[in-house]
Regions:
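Intrinsically disordered, low-complexity Ser/Thr/Pro-rich tracts
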Residues: 1-68, 80, 91-94, 98-101, ...
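Surface beta-loop-beta hairpin patches that serve as ligand-binding interfaces in beta-rich domains
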Residues: 52-56, 60, 98, 442-458, ...
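Acidic Gly/Asp/Thr-rich repetitive segments characteristic of extracellular carbohydrate-active
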Residues: 54-56, 74-114, 118-119, 511
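Feature marks extracellular polysaccharide-active and adherence modules
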Residues: 108, 133-135, 155, 164, ...
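Right-handed parallel beta-helix/beta-spiral solenoid domain characteristic of secreted/periplasmic
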Residues: 109, 123-174, 222, 464-468
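Surface-exposed loop/turn segments connecting beta-strands in extracellular beta-rich domains
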Residues: 114-115, 140, 170-172, 185, ...
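Predominantly extracellular beta-rich ligand-binding scaffolds that present long acidic/polar faces
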Residues: 115-116, 120-121, 127, 307-312, ...
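Extracellular beta-strand/beta-solenoid scaffold signature
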Residues: 115-120, 144-153, 170-179, 194-215, ...
Length: 533
């Protein structure tokens, strides 16, 4: 029999794709294959499935055109003019010392060995940012050799700067520091790994004012942050005001060395407004997202956490100490309470989130309420919390075979607006409401269904108590809804965001939870060519 050369075998297929998928894009081809695919913008994380890893363009330069005014290369020379690719500079420090407002310094790929910290002291202006960016298609690696404490330090007052497209490695303390009084700084397309913290904003003791002032108007986006010993992206002592964290993957912090209570994925002790959106925060030793833990006066305004996937963090998932809005988040696999809010005086909105299958992994979990709002602390025995809960799914929280499932705790200071939620965690205690008088504070699933909860609280209109019918449960968790889910088309129209956790537009009758169920409106056929290796 004649043998077929598989390395030359090509199959020409027609790939049938539901047109609804085109809004999300398809994954990248496997190395070694020649595949014609539709790909998302490099600034969009995917895929949508819970167990798959999202594709972030960690060190790829921004997709906008880059006009380089200067060049740096590992084999360059700081004595050269740096204005051509054939006569580049050699070091980040020289580039930082020399660049002027409006300059774009392009770094060629390769490893830049640091023997000491690089200090950025020059500022751009409102119309002329100083940009340090990877040369298109290449990845410059800033390497501390395991001995340099910090790699990049934006000195006090350094502002109007962009840093884009770098990998930071082998530092011992912080990969990047913004010391204080830094404003209008853009950090994007970074891959930062290791140290005590990957990126640190402000300097000083935890409970004290910052040594060099706050930082403000900072954007961190389209980056991967991982493997630090303590909190990966850390604003302590703060404040960090007017912050945007967007399309960032944060993982594996606090897993080695001393961990847990100082090892959150994203931790901002003080400051607002803060926007955290479209991030994937997973597998960290402490909390996933922890905001405003030192804003003890409460009433933090402009705090928005939306369209994030917060997965398998060993303590809490999302923690809003002093107020904010949670919208369209997927929260599963935490080791402790999935959501903890309202430690201080707060106004909180929790809208269209899916919070399920938390406290199931016995290797790091401990049993607690799945959602906690207004828990009594020494500072405020019952903090006053104005809380809105609408269109959320709370289901299957805490392993029923290991201590039993758990529900929601609402403290005595909670002023509640609650309707159009689905509860399916603990049949004999879905809600513990300490603010209720005249009866036991624990409400069963049946009491939500039969109107007892509504009679005592005036809340609970259109709540559901049926199994939500996710695509799959533990351990292969996928919290998308099946077509027959009771959550489909049963959300509050007035309160639902315009889109869902994946940016898909919600229809005229929105679903409960973070994911809007959808079906293809048409099918198209795309040619697919595969070469076997």
């Amino acid at each position: 029999m004649q043998k077929t050369n598989l390395s030359r075998l090509r199959s020409h297929l027609m790939l049938m794709i539901p047109i609804g998928l085109l809004a999300c894009g398809l994954g990248s081809p496997v190395p070694g294959d020649e595949t014609v695919v539709l790909t998302p913008s490099p600034l969009v994380a995917g895929p949508a499935t819970e167990t798959g890893e999202p594709q972030f363009p960690a060190t790829a330069a921004a997709t906008t055109a880059v006009t380089c005014t200067h060049y740096v290369a590992p084999n360059g020379d700081d004595k050269d003019p740096g204005t051509t690719t054939t006569q580049p500079w050699a070091t980040f420090q020289h580039a930082a010392d020399t660049a002027q407002p409006g300059d774009t310094v392009c770094f060629r790929g390769g490893t830049y060995a640091f023997t000491e910290e690089a200090y950025l002291t020059q500022s751009g202006t409102a119309g002329a940012t100083i940009t340090f960016i990877a040369y298109p298609g290449e990845t410059p690696v800033l390497d501390g050799g395991g001995s340099v404490g910090e790699l990049l330090i934006l000195d006090q007052y350094t502002s109007y700067v962009r840093i884009s497209g770098f990998a930071l490695r082998n530092f011992t303390i912080w990969g990047m520091e913004l010391s204080g009084e830094n404003r209008y700084v853009q950090l994007d397309h970074l891959d930062v790994a290791g140290g005590e913290a990957s990126i640190h904003f402000t300097v000083g003791e935890t409970e004290a004012p910052p040594d060099y002032g706050p930082v403000e108007h900072i954007t961190l986006e389209d980056s991967t942050i991982h493997g630090s010993e303590y909190s990966a992206v850390d604003c302590t002592p703060g404040p960090c005001n007017h912050m945007v964290i967007r399309r960032v993957e944060i993982y594996d912090t606090g897993i080695v060395g001393e961990s847990f209570y100082g090892s959150d994925g994203l931790e901002f002790a003080r400051g607002y407004p803060v926007l955290v959106e479209d991030c994937y925060v997973h597998d960290n030793g402490g909390d996933g997202i922890d905001l405003n833990s030192r804003d003890r006066q409460g009433n933090a305004t402009g705090v928005v956490v939306r369209r994030n996937r917060v997965v398998r963090n060993h303590l809490n998932g999302i923690k809003l100490w002093a107020g904010g809005r949670m919208e369209n988040n997927i929260v599963w696999g935490q080791g402790n309470s999935a959501v903890w809010v309202g430690t201080f005086t707060s106004t909180l909105e929790i809208i269209n989130n899916t919070i399920a299958y938390n406290m199931w992994d016995t290797t790091y979990s401990e049993r607690n309420w799945a959602v906690v709002a207004g828990y009594p602390e020494e500072i405020l025995p019952y903090p006053p919390v104005t809380l809105t809960l609408v269109n959320n799914i709370f289901a299957f929280n805490a392993d029923p075979t290991d201590g039993g499932s758990t529900g929601m705790y609402l403290g005595g200071g909670v002023q509640l607006t609650e309707h159009h939620n689905l509860y399916y965690s603990r049949a004999d205690g879905e809600i513990t409401a300490e603010f209720v008088s005249g009866r036991d504070p624990d409400f069963t699933r049946a009491e939500i269904a039969d109107g007892t909860w509504t009679n005592f609280t005036g809340q609970g209109q259109n709540d559901l108590t049926d199994a939500p019918l996710f695509v799959s449960g533990w351990p292969g968790v996928n919290l998308h809804l099946q077509e027959s889910s009771p959550a489909v088309d049963n959300g509050s129209i007035a309160d639902a965001p315009a889109d869902d956790a994946e940016g898909r537009v919600r229809d005229a009758q929105p679903d409960i939870g973070a994911y809007e169920w959808w079906e293809p409106v048409a099918w198209i056929y795309v040619p697919l060519t595969i070469r076997s290796s």
